């Protein structure tokens, strides 16, 4: 596969994962926790695909500059790394929404 297509696969998978993470956050705000968790799982699958492609590029390069570094490659790396961070934060925020929903339910039961 041409390098441009490989790099676009990283970008597409990372962007899809990011969209799924934000969808999970929107669902968590409405207390749709099961659906939010499913979106996070789907995001993880997309990230795994992107990371596998990244790993293959690193292996092909062997630290010797065999894979040409282009601006679009840097762009793909940026998408991947920021999406990994977004996925980690979304996972924590969904957990926080679940925790807060449980605390609110306890308060309502007490009154």
Task: Label each residue range with its predicted role.
Residues 1-111:
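Terminal alpha-helical segments
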């Amino acid at each position: 596969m041409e390098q441009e297509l490989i790099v676009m696969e990283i970008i597409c998978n990372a962007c899809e994962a990011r969209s799924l993470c934000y969808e999970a956050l929107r669902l968590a705000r409405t207390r749709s926790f099961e659906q939010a968790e499913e979106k996070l799982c789907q995001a993880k699958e997309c990230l795994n695909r992107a990371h596998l492609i990244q790993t293959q590029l690193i292996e092909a390069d062997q630290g010797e500059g065999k894979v040409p570094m282009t601006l679009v490659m840097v762009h793909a790396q940026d998408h991947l790394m920021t999406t990994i961070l977004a996925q980690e934060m979304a996972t924590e925020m969904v957990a926080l929404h679940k925790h807060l929903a449980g605390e609110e339910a306890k308060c309502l039961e007490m009154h």
